[in-house]
Amino acid sequence: LGFLFEAYSQKRRRLGPMAVIHPIRAAALYCRAENRVGAVDLLTALFHDVLEDIHPGKFENGVWKEMESSLFRILKRLGPRNEQRLTENLLNLTKLEDESYYEYIGRLLDHCEETTDLVQIKLADRLDNTLDMRIDLRDPLEGIDFFQVIFQILFVPNYRSKSDEPHPTTSTVLNGARRLHQLFKNAVLLSLVWRKVDRRSGRSFRSLFDAVATASLREAQRTLLHLIRQI
């Protein structure tokens, strides 16, 4: 955790919170779904974005050397075999610069024929990113029937729903295009996982898959309500 806090100390999420919260929450979601988690899988979840986010040029030389030393100590404690496995996991979870998102997820799934651990970590990553898209103090879907509201907005003159009432929101808004891009990523991941991963996989896999699907659907409904109200 000390390495992560140092690595992400200068970075923030798009909605404002410290960036280090994301890998910690993603790891927590993964661990919550699993019955037992080994050291390599836990470190994979915590470090899943490190190769993409952390580069020497972003730190002063002394700080980078200290971070390297900290990381080497962690790897040494794992032993050669587990160190190699962790490295391979992180490489597989890192999108290459010239890859499309579709190609990236396809490559990831090609390395998961014998185990769904990496897929589950990726699902936990996407779940946290999806939940992080909205930090409104009140959910616009709270206490309403989505399809009833859509029908009434479209066909009932001067309709005003409970969700149209002003309510407290945060001062930071996630750009609409970025919101749709996050949902696109979820759609690609879920569709490819559905096609390539054995649907009889364990309870932890199914719970994470269902959680990402549910969170994506809820966010898509919120987005559609917002768009229809602009008509």
Language model features: what each stretch is:
Residues 1-231:
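Active-site helical microenvironments for divalent-metal-assisted chemistry
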